[in-house]
Amino acid sequence: MAEQQKGLTYADAGVDIDAGNALVERIKPAAKRTARPGTVSGLGGFGALFDLKAAGYHDPVLVAATDGVGTKLRIAIDTGEVDTIGIDLVAMCVNDLVCQGAEPLFFLDYFATGKLEVAQAARIIEGIAEGCAASGCALIGGETAEMPGMYHKGDFDLAGFAVGAMERGADLPQGVAEGDVLLGLGSNGVHSNGYSFVRKVVELSGLGWDAPAPFGGDSLGRALLAPTRLYVKQALAAVRAGGVHALAHITGGGLTENLPRVLPEGLGARIDLSAWELPSVFRWLAETASMAEPELLKTFNCGIGMIVVVAADRADEIAALLAAEGETVTRIGEVIAGEGVSYDGRLL
């Protein structure tokens, strides 16, 4: 009797269930380290549970945010430097949550690739866990999708989803008024927006990712992968102190597009560009691309990753509090009557 032919398996189609299970086991300790009051369940269930009462809330309003890392991923993939890209993913979500006045509570990630490499995926998700722990946010679940034929070899994509809460009536922006002071919190470089432009500039420069960064520091690739700053704990400390009327996360659209999102109709902002030094990475990008200053200001954070809008009579106190939390704080302008953002001085 002829030997029975072996049937086709899921692994033959390119999906390795065992690799997925191995990844879950490997990242469980990192996820466990992010546990906080309210965390009920660990990884592995069909859904993840979170107890708002145990987290200390009485009449909470939930706030949700989702985001990705954009084409910064391309640099991480091309250089193999994937350890901090997960921090970027968390920062892009939780920094948005805090702008609504919410405390980040829990986070879920989505990791998709053509062929799951457990070691690579673990490095990425451990970075996500690091960002969550630094934000007081529990990593309570996620999805790993192995999809052969959908991605080139070695490529992957990331998305994140965060949920936070605040007590009813504590949402931001609230009470923004003419004369309010704008406090700028320093960025850590490009953060996670504008990387399609960045990659085009690098192409024009003729430099490789392993070349020394023209603006100083490490290799060009590593310098451009500096992780997005997490502003959660220090921003929440300022909010709880009172006097904070709004927070604006400076992402895609730069200062020009993001600050107006937290200003009520009839109010604009005046920013003094001479108040801070343009970081060298932005100067290099602008000079290499012959980029006009208005374009720079509506593309990048230009060294200011978060703007805190505060009552004028509380500005010094809030600035001191933020500085004590480790922030680089600069008084960059004020809220004025009008619309949009106007600028005094020059960055370039």
Swiss-Prot record:
Organism domain of life: Bacteria
Catalytic activity of the protein: 2-formamido-N(1)-(5-O-phospho-beta-D-ribosyl)acetamidine + ATP = 5-amino-1-(5-phospho-beta-D-ribosyl)imidazole + ADP + phosphate + H(+)
Pathway: Purine metabolism; IMP biosynthesis via de novo pathway; 5-amino-1-(5-phospho-D-ribosyl)imidazole from N(2)-formyl-N(1)-(5-phospho-D-ribosyl)glycinamide: step 2/2
Keyword Cell membrane attached: no
EC class: ligase
Keywords: ATP-binding, Cytoplasm, Ligase, Nucleotide-binding, Purine biosynthesis
GO molecular function, one term: ATP binding
EC number(s) given by UniProt: 6.3.3.1
InterPro entries named among the record's database cross-references: PurM-like_C_dom (IPR010918), PurM-like_C_sf (IPR036676), PurM-like_N (IPR016188), PurM-like_N_sf (IPR036921), PurM_cligase (IPR004733)
Any one GO BP annotation for this protein: adenine biosynthetic process
Gene3D superfamilies documented for this protein: PurM-like C-terminal domain (3.90.650.10), PurM-like, N-terminal domain (3.30.1330.10)
Signal peptide: none
GO cellular component term of the entry, any: cytosol
Compartments it resides in: Cytoplasm
UniProt cross-references to PANTHER family, sorted A to Z: TRIFUNCTIONAL PURINE BIOSYNTHETIC PROTEIN ADENOSINE-3, TRIFUNCTIONAL PURINE BIOSYNTHETIC PROTEIN ADENOSINE-3-RELATED
Family: Belongs to the AIR synthase family.
Protein's recorded name: Phosphoribosylformylglycinamidine cyclo-ligase
Organism: Cereibacter sphaeroides (strain KD131 / KCTC 12085)
The organism's taxonomic lineage, starting at the top: Bacteria, Pseudomonadati, Pseudomonadota, Alphaproteobacteria, Rhodobacterales
